Structures are given as C-alpha cells and as structure tokens.
Amino acid sequence: MSKFEVTHLNLFYGENHALKDISIDIPARQVTALIGPSGCGKSSLLRTLNRMNDLVEGVKITGTVTFDGDDIYANIDVKHLRMSVGMVFQKPNPFPMSIYENIAFGLKAQGVKDKAVLDAVVENSLRGAALWEEVKTRLHTPAFGLSGGQQQRLCIARAIAMEPEVILMDEPTSALDPIATHKIEELMDELRKKFTIVIVTHSMNQAKRISDKTAFFWMGELVEHGDTEQIFNNPKDHRTQGYVSGHFG
C-alpha cells in the first residue's frame, strides 16, 4: 500500500529545473532512502511531500502528489498535512526551552491544557524516541544541555508527539558522531513499525542498513528505485552502479 504517490512531478526554483518528471510510489510503514550526489533533487522531493517548498520564493510545481489518495496540492489543508507528515532536519533544532516544553509545545498550540495528558504524551514520545531513560530526571532543564545525538532524538520525539503518519528525515545523522548515529539507526528500526519514513542520506552504508526501498537521483532525475537490496546488488542503470560502487558522485 502506497502512502504517497508522486506522478510526473516537475519542480522549478525560478529557472532551475530541480525535479524532472518524477514518478514514484512510497510504501506505508517502510523506510525509503533517497540517495544521490549533492544537488540531485532528493531534498527537493522530500520537502515536496509536506509542501515545505511552498515557502521558497519563485517555486513552481507541476504534476501530482497524493497522500493516502488525496492530492496534497488540491484537496488537503496544509496545516493538517504538516501535522500528518513530520520532519526531522539535518542539524538538531530543539526549541530554546526545556526538554518537557519541547515535546508539549505542539500540543499546547492545539489547545491541549490537561497536565495529565501532556505528561503522558511527553513520556510516551520520549520513550518512542529511546530518550526517556536518559532524561526523565531532568525534564525541566534546557534542551540545549543535551548532546547532539540526544537533541536529534528529542526532535524525533517532538515529531512523534503530534502523532504523524509519516516522518521525513533530511540527513538526520550527518552532524552526529558514529555512536549517536547508531542509536538513531536503531531507533528508526523501531519507528518503521508505526510510521512511514522517508530519509535523505549521503551514506551508502546507512541506506543499505536501514532502508527497505531506495531511490537514486541524478541531476534532477529519478534514475532508478526499488528494493534496497536490488539497487545496491543488482542495479539496472549504469549510473546507479557507478554511484553505489563509489566510482562517482
């Protein structure tokens, strides 16, 4: 079952044709990795899935993107879409407030005031991000006091708190050390049981370790996509072969 269906998508930043006739289905409750060299369009596609590209001046989009069958550019309220499709960025971006308030912020913005409800969501979200045991005694201390890896897991917990169906991740471990990266990858293995995950990564090894599906982009084109094992072990296109083998890119 597809969570997203992208059909003949073209995206322009002014005169720059960043995505060229992209068609891809993204399956539910699996991890899909988007790979390719810098500037190939993978982050542009990621940000199209929750309409973050709307915020870029001069952007133009043609084609269709459906989320659970609904055209996200025609039939879905953007606010609702972004609640359903959470995002974790390259660098951890905790809010300048306590660990607790980072998680509760979105719920409070929606009008939730019941402390018991907030407490439960904060704990469950931190547990879901494998962070609870590390922070449960300091929930009301500043989030900036956490390590980089902990901050990134906090950002994942913040996304989980809104009960999304999808989590988009734009190189979520590129600023982290190997130990923190390993924890995030272990976490993603658990998250896939509940959420659809789409991740942009420059690490071929990471894509092989964590993803069910892989899509390879090159100069704005989707060259090839399919099962991760097939993409890495038996690619059909010579450009894919060259990239995953490290010959270029």
Curated annotation (Swiss-Prot):
GO terms for biological process: phosphate ion transmembrane transport. The keyword Transport applies. ATP binds at G36, P37, S38, G39, C40, G41, K42, S43. Residues 4-244 form the ABC transporter domain. It catalyses: phosphate(out) + ATP + H2O = ADP + 2 phosphate(in) + H(+). It is found in: Cell inner membrane. Keywords: ATP-binding, Cell inner membrane, Cell membrane, Membrane, Nucleotide-binding, Phosphate transport, Translocase, Transport. InterPro entries: AAA+_ATPase (IPR003593), ABC_transporter-like_ATP-bd (IPR003439), ABC_transporter-like_CS (IPR017871), P-loop_NTPase (IPR027417), PstB-like (IPR005670). Belongs to the ABC transporter superfamily. Phosphate importer (TC 3.A.1.7) family. PANTHER family: ABC TRANSPORTER I FAMILY MEMBER 17. The complex is composed of two ATP-binding proteins (PstB), two transmembrane proteins (PstC and PstA) and a solute-binding protein (PstS). Part of the ABC transporter complex PstSACB involved in phosphate import. Responsible for energy coupling to the transport system. This is Phosphate import ATP-binding protein PstB 2. It comes from Shewanella oneidensis (strain ATCC 700550 / JCM 31522 / CIP 106686 / LMG 19005 / NCIMB 14063 / MR-1).
